[in-house]
Amino acid sequence: MSRENQKETNVIRTTLPSLSFVFPMYNEIGNVERCVAEALATGRKITSDLEIVLVDDASTDGCGALADQLAERHPEVKVMHHPKNRKLGGALRTGFAAATKDWVLYIDSDLPIEMDDALLAVPLTSNAEMVIGNRQGRAEGPKREIMSWVYNRLIRVLFGLNVRDVNFAFKLFRRSILERISLQSEGSFIDAELLIETHKAGFRIAELPLRYFERTAGVSTLGSGSVVVKILHEMADYRRAAALRPVRSAPAPPARP
């Protein structure tokens, strides 16, 4: 079966009752319109009850104003503005708190996937409360690949989380998970924290290989030295704090609507 036919079969076979897209944005004026257009097109294939949450993390390039214009045009879109830059973790926590639908799909605003590939994740929700992507076809150079391998290995050894691609910004999950976990990260450790907390609470995590595309607009800061240092500091802080917090186990998986 071709990939295109597989997508259409998934659409017919499985949908979601409702879905919130969450896009964290900092100086993404070159990507925001595409995010909304593609989320609307793909989201309508997944559900009839859709919202798109754009989190403007104190952008300086006009991204926030453009997001507001898109919200005026499309009732599915709502925009959250930070008066001060709070980095990825702060932006995602704001977006997750603003999401109101049964399922949440977090994707980076540089759109590292073909949006319709999200349809391939929907059938996996029959047996998992969270579906995460792992990148296929990465071409970021040996330095980034080594950093990624070391980071994933650290997370596995320190926290017992065995997934292939902790930091890939494709995570589809039940919003009810957020009621049972605690997220504190303000930086890029948020991806690992979300997965670790979900795993510790007993929820099921499925993995989906996804084609990866380099950004075509805007500037990534994930590989910068300051970001890496902040991730390591937040990891150490999290490990210390986690030892003091009780673990809340997951309820029985809900019946699928």
Identify the meaning behind each predicted range.
Residues 35, 63, 92, 116-118, ...:
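Acidic donor-diphosphate engagement hotspot in glycosyltransferases and nucleotidyltransferases
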Residues 56-65, 111:
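A conserved acidic beta->alpha catalytic loop
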Residues 16-19, 40-54, 62, 75-78:
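Short loop->beta transition adjacent to catalytic acidic/histidine clusters or analogous donor-positioning motifs
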Residues 82-98, 103-106, 115-188, 215-234, ...:
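Acceptor/aglycone-binding surface of glycosyltransferases and processive sugar-polymer synthases
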Residues 28-43:
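Short, well-formed alpha-helical segments that are part of the catalytic scaffolds
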Residues 50, 64-98:
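Conserved donor nucleotide-binding strand/loop of the catalytic core
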Residues 1-19, 158-161, 184-257:
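Hydrophobic helical membrane-anchoring modules
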Residues 30-34, 61-70:
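Acidic helix N-cap motif at the loop->helix transition within catalytic regions
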